[in-house]
Amino acid sequence: MFNLDFDFSLIILILDLFGTVVFAVTGALRAIEHKYDIVGIIILATVTGILGGVMRDTILGVFPPNNFSDTIHIVFTTITAVVIFFLYHKTKKYENLFNIFDAVGLGVFTLTGVSIAHSLYSTNYVLIVISGLLTAFGGGILRDVFVREPPMVFTKEVYAVASFIGVIVFLILINLRVPFEYTAIMVIFVTTGIRLISIKLHWNLPRVKM
């Protein structure tokens, strides 16, 4: 993986796998809504779950990307897709399931993106911000493109802004030497919270009215 100490690596791996599963759920749900077969569901779940991390590793110069060199992420997305395939009719009554999973995934992947970038390039704030944002919604953009929908990050409520605020929270707390575990909780809580509140209250960024 990355050249990090054991505890940090383990925490990031656990969070990364959790975020991968959460985003894989959103990919599987989108695929089912668009009447994909089981193979299509697995592919879209995998695209959504891992390609944000692949983009992150690419700009950080990590080759091959961790999600390809360690197949555990693909195993997790495949299992997740199959589970959703069989349980979909039991879960579809929960109307907000997609939004909840997407918001949690946004928070977790914002954290893992900035954490890994900071561990490698602690003084390159531009790279840290880009890494956090790409990890957070890179897979989601490709998910929406695959099903021919406008990417949520560009159209739905407050999305990219929530991730960006999470990145800023991370940088502030890390520079204040707040312990990583507390920083992690705050980043996930703030990013996910802003996203869910924006959905609930229908917050949107300004756009041109046609």
Give short role names for the model-derived ranges.
Residues 43-47, 54-60, 130, 134, ...:
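Short, structured motif recognition centered on aromatic/hydrophobic residues
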Residues 1-50, 54-63:
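N-terminal topogenic module of multi-pass integral membrane proteins
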Residues 24-34, 57, 82-95, 141-151, ...:
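C-terminal ends of transmembrane helices
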Residues 1-9, 58-68, 114-127, 172-183:
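Helix-coil boundary and interhelical linker segments in multi-pass alpha-helical membrane proteins
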Residues 78-117:
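Ordered, amphipathic secondary-structure segments that act as subunit-interaction surfaces
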